[in-house]
């Protein structure tokens, strides 16, 4: 009699556990098929508050026709904290005037740390419309020299260099910062 009770109890617990296992498998399949498991870049904007701030560096030379569209698209990015630093690399066209007019730039006296040698920086401007937009006006030295000037002026630990005719997707910064969040010792991607 005791053996029968033991087998009934074991069978009961075994069948209950198998049913629970089946329910968990079906639930996991439903979660995956309904898209409830998401990658980090698909998380809501609130999660980007945990992401490190980024400086977007835009070296530009004679880009008066495309620079406004580029800067406007960069200012529309979906990221918690970032700045856009446009570096006018001694343009011969009216690019600086176009930027001053469209973004209400005013001279901005700020400390400029010379950590990397560059051509002479003539002035730094700040937008009165967009507090996260600055423009550096410098003598011509090429794209690498402009990026170095942008690094010297950047406020944030991460920077991303983009061409002056680039249009980025709204979630681009969230995707770019992902490797830095996964591996804090990373220095470049």
Role assignments for model-derived ranges:
Residues 170-189:
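Conserved donor NDP-sugar-binding/catalytic core segment of glycosyltransferases
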Residues 88-108:
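A conserved acidic beta->alpha catalytic loop
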Residues 159:
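Short aromatic/hydrophobic "clamp" motif used to bind/position activated sugar donors
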Residues 163-167:
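The conserved acidic donor/metal-binding loop of glycosyltransferases
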Residues 1-48:
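N-terminal membrane-anchoring/stem segments of glycan-assembly enzymes
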Residues 42, 70, 115-154, 174-175:
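Glycine-rich, basic loop-to-helix element that forms the pyrophosphate-binding segment
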Residues 72-81, 101-109:
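Short, acidic, metal-binding catalytic loop of nucleotide-sugar glycosyltransferases
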Residues 52-55, 83:
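Cell-envelope/extracellular polymer assembly enzymes that use nucleotide-activated donors
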């Amino acid at each position: 009699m005791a053996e029968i009770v033991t087998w009934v109890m074991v069978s009961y617990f075994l069948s209950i556990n198998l049913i629970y296992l089946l329910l968990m498998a079906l639930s996991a399949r439903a979660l995956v098929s309904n898209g409830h498991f998401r990658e980090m870049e698909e998380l809501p904007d609130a999660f980007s508050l945990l992401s490190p701030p980024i400086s977007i560096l835009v070296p530009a030379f004679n880009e008066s026709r495309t620079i406004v569209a580029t800067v406007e698209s960069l200012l529309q990015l979906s990221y918690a904290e970032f700045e856009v630093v446009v570096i006018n690399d001694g343009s011969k066209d009216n690019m600086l005037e176009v930027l001053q007019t469209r973004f209400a730039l005013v001279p901005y006296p700020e400390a400029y740390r010379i950590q990397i040698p560059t051509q002479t920086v003539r002035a730094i401007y700040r937008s009165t419309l967009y507090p996260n937009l600055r423009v550096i006006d410098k003598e011509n030295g090429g794209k690498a020299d402009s990026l170095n000037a942008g690094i010297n002026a950047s406020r944030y630990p991460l920077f991303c260099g983009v061409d002056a005719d680039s249009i980025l997707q709204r979630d681009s910064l969230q995707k770019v910062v992902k490797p830095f969040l996964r591996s804090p010792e990373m220095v470049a991607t």
